[in-house]
């Protein structure tokens, strides 16, 4: 049986101890994707579509190249394994050994180069891919987030949510918001694409959650145009992009989306609390969105409306494999999280 590059994930009503007697929250569990995060959708879609095009042109199978210190590289490796493609992933020196092993275990060749993602990416594109092209191979560069075909793949999450709500006899007007974490804007862009395709982009507001220290979207909004962050300091390393995709920035204003910025301390506290409550370990990038489940007053404030008993909010638990429970405890201790 052929492996697929992504799976339909559960949309589960979860009750949070947040002072409300009834839960509004339905959580979409993208941590259950083959690559451990939502990135399996978009990156897998890009690789599959590009490989099919290469085969139809008679170019043979692709050689796939990804630069990522984390979840994008793992998603690329996992997708390539499902299609029997060679995959090379360049990671910076800051990448944790356990993540390197995860990517290797998924069948990819891992090269460690550079002090940050930018240096790893430059080495991948200008050195490794150039060498491979000289050998006559058809190559594919996989950006972690800024690619329209990747957004197309991510947009399937909206189609699934609509289908799952229908299966539970939940009408779409009951959905008052969709919450997702934002780094470079790949997931956000996919959600906007999916909502727009289903004529919902102007009906369901998207709440974009970032952490202070890598809040490039929020800073860009305040600036009135996209900015580039010179330094990324948040513990939510999977959100640490120096820039926001142009489509994400433009869509935010077009569709009346909302921006929330949280502290590292708040997000780490939520990650530990969620692990204790549900036995799910989520990294800070994912915990950022889940934080609003424990603190619905933030959501009501940003939406400028009360959320009532019959209303529903969708939370995208984006997943990620960058931190263990021990990592969360250590980071919490360092930042004096109570």
Curated annotation (Swiss-Prot):
Assigned GO CC terms: cytoplasm
GO MF: L-serine ammonia-lyase activity; pyridoxal phosphate binding; threonine deaminase activity
Keyword Acetylation: no
Cofactor (UniProt): pyridoxal 5'-phosphate
Pathway involvement of the protein, from the record: Carbohydrate biosynthesis; gluconeogenesis
Enzyme class: lyase
Subcellular localization, as worded in the UniProt entry: Cytoplasm
Catalytic activity: L-serine = pyruvate + NH4(+)
Assigned protein family: Belongs to the serine/threonine dehydratase family.
Annotated protein name in UniProt: L-serine dehydratase
Gene name linked to the record: SDL1
């Amino acid at each position: 049986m052929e492996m697929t590059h992504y799976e339909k994930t559960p949309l589960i009503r979860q009750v949070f101890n947040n002072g409300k007697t009834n839960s509004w929250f339905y959580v979409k569990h993208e941590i259950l994707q083959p690559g451990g995060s939502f990135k399996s959708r978009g990156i897998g879609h890009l690789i599959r579509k590009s490989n099919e095009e290469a085969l139809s042109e008679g170019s043979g199978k692709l050689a796939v190249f990804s630069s990522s210190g984390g979840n994008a590289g793992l998603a690329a490796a996992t997708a390539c394994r499902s299609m029997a493609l060679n995959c090379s992933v360049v990671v910076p020196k800051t990448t944790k050994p356990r993540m390197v092993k995860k990517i290797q275990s998924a069948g990819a060749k891992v090269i460690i180069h550079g002090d940050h993602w930018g240096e790893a990416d430059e080495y991948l594109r200008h050195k490794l891919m150039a060498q491979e092209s000289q050998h006559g191979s058809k190559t594919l560069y996989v950006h972690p987030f800024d690619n329209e075909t990747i957004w197309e793949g991510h947009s399937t999450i909206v189609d699934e949510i609509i289908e799952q709500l229908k299966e539970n006899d939940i009408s779409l007007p009951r959905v008052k918001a969709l919450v997702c974490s934002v780094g470079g804007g790949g997931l956000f862009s996919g959600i906007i694409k999916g909502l727009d395709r289903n004529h919902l982009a102007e009906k369901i507001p998207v709440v974009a959650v970032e952490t202070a220290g890598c809040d490039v979207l929020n800073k860009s909004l305040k600036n009135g145009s996209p900015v580039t962050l010179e330094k990324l300091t948040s513990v939510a390393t999977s959100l640490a992009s120096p820039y926001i995709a142009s489509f994400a920035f433009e869509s935010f204003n077009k569709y009346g989306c909302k921006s929330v910025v949280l502290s590292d301390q708040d997000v780490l506290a939520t990650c530990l609390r969620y692990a204790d409550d549900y036995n799910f370990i989520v990294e800070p990038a994912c915990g950022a969105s889940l934080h609003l489940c424990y603190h619905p007053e933030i959501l009501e404030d940003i939406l400028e409306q009360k959320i009532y008993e019959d209303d529903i909010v969708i939370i995208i638990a984006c997943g990620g494999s960058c931190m263990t429970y021990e990592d969360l405890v250590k980071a919490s201790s360092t930042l004096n999280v109570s």
